[in-house]
Amino acid sequence: KPEKVVATLSSLCVEMDARYELLKAAGVRNIKEYNAKFRKRVLNPEKGHRFMPYIVVIVDEFADLIMTAGKEVETPIARLAQKARAIGIHVILATQRPSANVITGVIKANFPSRMAFKVASGIDSKTILDSTGAQQLIGRGDMLISNNSEIERVQCAFIDTPEVTAICEHIASQPGYPHALILPEPLVSGEGIDGGGEGVPFGDRDPLFEE
């Protein structure tokens, strides 16, 4: 549901701001330096310091989301893409409809690394990469990657369902965290969503969350 997505993105923005405060208090520049200090027991948990896990936010079909939630989704995603990398929060967006009203100027400005498979037209290619060419790809994993205005043509590997299952089983077999990472819960006010609260209770989570 769009409202749940907006709440989650807002929670991640609150988490991002909290992490930057911890970096400032620790006198470090990024998550790698912070966690190194924490492992060496230089940072005191009693003063609010904690180990920071990396978080990857994946939006599978961004077009559906932007059409239903609009600016409510675009603003927090742009904030996270712009500032959150240094504190270990990364955003991946995917869409099958690369139109200008989906991949807006705000989104493009904050996602320097972009990739495109075969698209229907040169306009779609320009929307994603700021350059034509993706409309001439041959398909079957043929793709273009744009990173800081440099475009490279590469072949994406095909992963079938059994291999995906094997990878997921391998990840699931590794030791994990003893408990889920609880994000700060945004509070709904008259002007929208704001940060606050103590976290999302387990009872309010999806029934398949722990799976």
Cite the ranges covered by each PLM segment.
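A short, structured beta-strand-centered segment in the mid-to-C-terminal lobe
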Residues: K1-A7
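P-loop NTPase motor-domain active sites and their immediate coupling elements
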Residues: A7-E211
